């Protein structure tokens, strides 16, 4: 059981109750009921108030009479009740604040501090507001009950943890969030909010823009009408005062009052003009504040867009650099392959026992049978060379030339390829083939047929290569130049034909061979004509 110490008793002044005397009732135990304790406290407070003041016999008769008396309207009662309520609320707030720190101060000291604070705010209470005081006592008792319950819970917790001595009561820690994640969420949420606000503002401004001129005209018209009406009223007042002055000629005081009224009306007109101007200024300032807020939102939205643009631009630049590096590496690989192929071809041509490079010409589209024949011959040559590779046997470490590289890039050094092929044909066969073919020597007819076949193959391959060169050069060259040259040639041929037809001289029907050693087409075809006479035709 905890005892509540009260402050030293003081004599009541002017028949008022002592507010500093609190509810001196014991705290409830575990088996007690809250309602009974509250009723006991109220009864004890009533008894104390009746003993000290002697004016409580009316209030202790019945609670119904107390309620009826409290409901009666009275200005003094309302004022006193408001003061007591404020004091009680402040006291209860202080008690609640004190009950949260039971580990630092004992309960009695907190009660004393609460009563001292309530005594500083209001020290006297009227007899008519005693019902309010009882409500204040009930609130204090409830706060004391809460404080006692918290104290018991802390004591029970201390007793339970004492024998074990293993449990350590730690204060609850706040949940820690990741700063970066929270900042990113906040920034994204802020950006979304700013964007939504920007959309709302832009839509509102666009909608207001359509009716802005009409609204301005209407407001100006209403302002002008109000000013005109005010001026008319002021002029009417002045006229009435002027009509009143002759009636008040005998009375000096009335004349002075009329003059003062005239001056006040003039000042009123000036004040109305000033009020109108100040009102316009105030409206402009308010509109400027609203517009400044909207502009701030728009500026923030633009900054967000700039930040997003800078981020995406940086990502785009990085992607471009990565693509350029990949393109460079991809382009460098074919160049290296071409260099290796050239070196390998030169080494193969220099060494008679090494392998020879294989080239397959790409088939032209518009060449017809020539391209097909050349492609078939190249395929035959490739099959023969592959058989020679199988006979000779290649090393495992050597790489065979890739065919698709030569198919896709046939246009480079075709003449060198053909020359190397001719040299390779004219060169003696490797030692392996000589060792295989020593058993049987070819005859003279076989040699002639083989040389004829090789000559035909070389001619066809050279024609095909020339056609492919011509096609490639035509593709590379500017088509406009080719077209202009072709048009010029056609125009020259047409002009020569026309000049020959226009400026041709008339000749006799009989062909003559005087002074001309060249035989014309007429002289050749003249004997085959239908004219059968041998002499010249008649003139």
Swiss-Prot record:
Interacts (via coiled-coil domain) with ITPR3. Interacts with SUN1 and SUN2. Interacts with microtubules. Interacts with HCN4; regulates HCN4 channel activity. The keyword Hydrolase does not apply. Residues 501-539 are lumenal. PANTHER family: INOSITOL 1,4,5-TRIPHOSPHATE RECEPTOR ASSOCIATED 2, LYMPHOID-RESTRICTED MEMBRANE PROTEIN, JAW1. The chain crosses the membrane at residues 480-500. It holds the Pfam family MRVI1. It is a single-pass type IV membrane protein. One of its GO terms (biological process) is immune system process. Plays a role in the delivery of peptides to major histocompatibility complex (MHC) class I molecules; this occurs in a transporter associated with antigen processing (TAP)-independent manner. May play a role in taste signal transduction via ITPR3. May play a role during fertilization in pronucleus congression and fusion. Plays a role in maintaining nuclear shape, maybe as a component of the LINC complex and through interaction with microtubules. Plays a role in the regulation of cellular excitability by regulating the hyperpolarization-activated cyclic nucleotide-gated HCN4 channel activity. The modification Phosphoserine is found at residues 347, 354, 408. Residues 435-449 have a biased composition (Basic and acidic residues). One of its GO terms (cellular component) is spindle pole. The modification Phosphothreonine is found at residue 78. One of its GO terms (molecular function) is microtubule binding. Residues 74-92 have a biased composition (Low complexity). The gene is Irag2. Spleen and thymus. Expressed at high levels in pre B-cells, mature B-cells and pre T-cells. Expressed at low levels in mature T-cells and plasma B-cells. Expressed in circumvallate (CV), foliate (FL) and fungiform (FF) taste papillae cells of the tongue epithelium. Belongs to the IRAG2 family. Its main location: endoplasmic reticulum. This is Inositol 1,4,5-triphosphate receptor associated 2.
């Amino acid at each position: 059981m905890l005892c509540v110490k009260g402050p030293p008793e003081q004599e009541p002044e002017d028949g008022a109750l002592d507010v500093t005397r609190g509810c001196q009732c014991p705290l409830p135990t575990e088996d007690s009921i809250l309602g009974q304790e509250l009723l006991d406290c109220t009864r004890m407070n009533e008894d104390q108030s009746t003993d000290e003041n002697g004016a409580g016999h009316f209030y202790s008769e019945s609670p119904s009479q107390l309620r009826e008396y409290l409901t009666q309207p009275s200005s003094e009662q309302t004022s006193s009740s408001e003061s007591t309520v404020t004091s009680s609320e402040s006291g209860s707030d202080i008690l609640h604040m004190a009950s949260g720190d039971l580990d630092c101060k004992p309960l009695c000291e907190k009660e004393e501090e609460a009563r001292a604070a309530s005594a500083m705010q209001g020290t006297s209470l009227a007899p008519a507001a005693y019902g309010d005081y009882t409500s204040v006592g009930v609130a204090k008792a409830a706060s004391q009950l809460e404080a006692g319950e918290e104290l018991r819970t802390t004591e029970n917790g201390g007793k339970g943890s004492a024998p074990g001595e293993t449990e350590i009561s730690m204060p609850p820690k706040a949940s820690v969030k990741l700063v970066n994640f929270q900042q990113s969420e906040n920034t994204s949420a802020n950006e979304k909010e700013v964007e939504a606000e920007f959309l709302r503002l832009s839509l509102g401004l666009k909608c207001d823009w359509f009716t802005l001129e009409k609204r301005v005209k209407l407001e100006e018209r209403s302002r002008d009408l109000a000013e005109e009406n005010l001026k008319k009223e002021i002029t009417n007042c002045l006229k009435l005062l002027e009509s009143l002055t002759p009636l008040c000629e005998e009375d000096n005081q009335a004349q002075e009052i009329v003059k003062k009224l005239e001056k006040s009306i003039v000042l009123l007109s000036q004040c109305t003009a000033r009020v109108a101007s100040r009102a316009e200024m105030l409206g402009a300032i308010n509109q400027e504040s609203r517009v400044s807020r909207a502009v701030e939102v728009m500026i923030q939205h633009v900054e967000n867009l700039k930040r997003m643009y800078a981020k995406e631009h940086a990502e785009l630049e990085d992607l471009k650099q990565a693509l350029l590096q990949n393109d460079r590496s991809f382009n460098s690989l074919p160049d290296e392959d071409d260099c290796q192929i050239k070196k390998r071809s030169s080494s193969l041509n220099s060494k008679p026992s090494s392998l020879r490079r294989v080239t397959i010409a790409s088939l032209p589209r518009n060449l017809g049978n020539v391209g097909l024949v050349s492609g078939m011959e190249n395929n035959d040559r490739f099959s023969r060379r592959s058989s020679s590779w199988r006979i000779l046997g290649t090393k495992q470490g050597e790489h065979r030339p890739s065919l698709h590289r030569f198919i896709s890039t046939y246009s480079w050094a075709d003449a060198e390829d053909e020359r190397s092929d001719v040299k390779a044909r004219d060169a003696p066969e490797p030692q392996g083939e000589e060792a295989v073919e020593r058993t049987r020597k070819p005859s003279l007819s076989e040699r002639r047929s083989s040389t004829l076949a090789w000559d035909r193959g070389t001619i066809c391959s050279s024609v095909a290569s020339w056609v492919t060169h011509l096609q490639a050069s035509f593709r590379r060259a500017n088509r406009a130049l080719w077209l202009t040259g072709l048009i010029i040639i056609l125009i020259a041929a047409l002009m020569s034909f026309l000049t020959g037809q226009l400026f041709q001289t008339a000749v006799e029907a009989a062909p003559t061979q005087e002074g001309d050693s060249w035989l014309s087409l007429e002289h050749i075809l003249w004997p085959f004509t239908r004219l059968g006479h041998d002499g010249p035709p008649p003139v």
